[in-house]
Amino acid sequence: MTDGLALAGTLLVLGVTLAVAVARPPYLPEAVAACAGGVLLVLVGAIGLSRASDALRALGPTIGFLAAMLLIADGCRREGLFDAMGALMARGSGGSPQRLLAFVFVIAAVITAVLSLDATIVLLTPVVFVTAARMRTSAKPQVYACAHLANSASLLLPVSNLTNLLAFHASKLSFLHFGALMALPTIAAVAVEWIVFRRFFAADLERPRRAGARPARPELPRFAVAVLAFTLTGFALSSVVGIEPVWFAAAGAAAISIPALARRTTTPVVLARAAEPGFLIFVLGLGVIVQAASVNGLDTAVRAVLPTGASLGDLLMIAALSAIFANLVNNLPATLMLVPVTAAAGTGPALATLIGVNVGPNLTYVGSLATLLWRRVLRTEDTDIELGEFLRLGALTVPAALLAATVLLWLALKV
């Protein structure tokens, strides 16, 4: 099989796999589509078995880390952390939609950074719906904030997003160094979102005519907070003590899951589902498909397009092209394709890629799996959104957030 034919076939398989992930037909799980696509490419010779195995081994630690963080997030839900966050938002806002939006911004940013964007989408969004209903105010600004902050605030830590984990392992940065470099870009992106949201949703943020009763002071679940503190401290010290962060994540998952099993407040089957094995298998299959595309010439094409320098102009170009690519093929395959190229060019290009693939997906529905998941959460709440409104909001936030975050990344790299 010629390289051109192999690349064309691989891109076709990638397109079909992503279409299944977006549409999620009940008769064809996304994991099955990705695995079938990867096996097919091995069978037709588009990628050798050894290269496919290498791709799976390279993704192994990332997959293990993600599974552990999903279990920690599920444990925090079970311990009542998200319900406490909802009560805190309702009490602190005092009936003001503007203050409620501020609380949602802060809490969504923190949850995204610490527990991952999936926790914000799946666990916080329903709480926001309930909180807004209790306050008798429109939930639209706050629900949109969950979607946008899940993407924009996921720049901060390696654990915040699967895309970050992929870049983290490729960049060879320590956990603390990664967070230090991405702190200012994250603040910049969130600040842009806040400014735009206040103006875009001005009519929805008017004070309601009737304020609901003020909720009682919430009590944070101390055990869940302690597990999170232990896990994050372990991440911060991982490079100092010479232990991979995945082991601290595994310890945190065990610490919050084993007592629940002992108390019979959960079961092994429930825990297995919480780890989302279907999604993890999908990522592994997708990794093989993207690797097949890379070895058949896609990496050469990417290298020809992306700058390799770390000047402000280069970083802006990398972030912009990464955002465009994420909205064309979704940010997960975009990261798998782009990070090996940009990480080889240095820390700056690799992190600029993350700005593009994390912030950029707020522009369209298909830009990230988190946004697609957010739409499914809205359907369970009998809520829908207007495509035009979503696109207008993205057009206002994404370019400005990309610019601000990339400029501050460039400044952070100079320190």
Stretch-by-stretch model annotation:
Residues 1-6, 25-28, 51-62, 173-185, ...:
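Interfacial loop-to-helix junctions that mark the boundaries of transmembrane helices
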Residues 2-12, 57-71, 113, 117-121, ...:
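Structural signature of hydrophobic alpha-helical transmembrane segments
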Residues 6-17, 26-47, 59-71, 123, ...:
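Hydrophobic mid-bilayer segments of alpha-helices in multi-pass membrane transport proteins
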Residues 49, 53-140, 279, 284-346:
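Membrane-embedded alpha-helical segments and adjacent helix-loop junctions characteristic
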Residues 95-103, 133-146, 173-184, 346-356, ...:
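Membrane-interface alpha-helices at helix entry/exit sites of multi-pass transporters
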Residues 137, 176-219, 359, 363-366, ...:
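Juxtamembrane and boundary regions of transmembrane helices in multi-pass small-molecule transporters
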Residues 188-267:
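Long, contiguous bundles of hydrophobic transmembrane helices that form the permeation core
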